[in-house]
Amino acid sequence: MDQYEKVEKIGEGTYGVVYKARDKVTNETIALKKIRLEQEDEGVPSTAIREISLLKEMQHGNIVRLQDVVHSEKRLYLVFEYLDLDLKKHMDSCPDFAKDPRMIKRFLYQILRGIAYCHSHRVLHRDLKPQNLLIDRQTNALKLADFGLARAFGIPVRTFTHEVVTLWYRAPEILLGSRHYSTPVDVWSVGCIFAEMVNQKPLFPGDSEIDELFKIFRTLGTPNEETWPGVTSLPDFKSSFPKWISKDLSAVVPNLDPAGIDLLNKMLCLDPSKRITARNALEHEYFKDIGFVP
């Protein structure tokens, strides 16, 4: 750890404290994540070390680069490139952002590009939210942070500071207890983020797993064997769920054009096997006039 000097604490992530720090060798500013593990006394599990080492191979313009992994005194530190703005802060500080459909389109395109890259390397995110989409103020390049960490460390119910980990972007198959989820869970999260960029408010802000599910079902309809084969066999599906019918998304996200609504419908498909892939979403007609994207 001697190579890095902490400058200031910049936040508390899902897994531990995040510092702005300086690389004493290159003088570069970096983000240093100190990972807090449940079994502090046992040190860092070798599985986590293996998973994290694989992430150093992931290099793409829309992914926050993991530059180094430091294992010292039973603690794990992850060294990332430093970006000081995230999509949540950006949306909160720019009320006019929603009035800029071109910017929303460019951000969405970059999110999907980063995800398609990760999925092509068989890496899931599982915890995508506006707070871990980082933005370079100079170029408006958007980069995904924390990819692959869920697999290495699991997703806690609460952070180490006892904050509740948000459910607002969690896919219905996870909420229904599926153990066999895959890449579609990330596409669902992106659909929620897309709607939030346009509406300037979260689409499904549930405060418990059941509240989250019911918010989803009230808008998209309660699934059944016809609309989602196999859904009634998922561990947490109950035949007693209220049977809501689906609403038209153009009424839910009124400021989005028809091509955008079509793409959103495909991303928010309840049945994960019918949900559009990130790769196919990039080819959607919504992006036909995209022009140059950083």
UniProtKB/Swiss-Prot annotation:
One of its GO terms (cellular component) is cyclin-dependent protein kinase holoenzyme complex. It catalyses: L-seryl-[protein] + ATP = O-phospho-L-seryl-[protein] + ADP + H(+); L-threonyl-[protein] + ATP = O-phospho-L-threonyl-[protein] + ADP + H(+); [DNA-directed RNA polymerase] + ATP = phospho-[DNA-directed RNA polymerase] + ADP + H(+). GO terms for molecular function: ATP binding; cyclin binding; cyclin-dependent protein serine/threonine kinase activity; protein serine kinase activity; RNA polymerase II CTD heptapeptide repeat kinase activity. ATP binds at I10, G11, E12, G13, T14, Y15, G16, V17, V18, K33. The keyword Kinase applies. Coiled coil: none annotated. Residues 4-287 form the Protein kinase domain. Phosphorylation at Thr-14 or Tyr-15 inactivates the enzyme, while phosphorylation at Thr-161 activates it. Its EC number is 2.7.11.22, 2.7.11.23. Belongs to the protein kinase superfamily. CMGC Ser/Thr protein kinase family. CDC2/CDKX subfamily. This is Cell division control protein 2 homolog. It comes from Oxybasis rubra (Red goosefoot). The gene is CDC2.
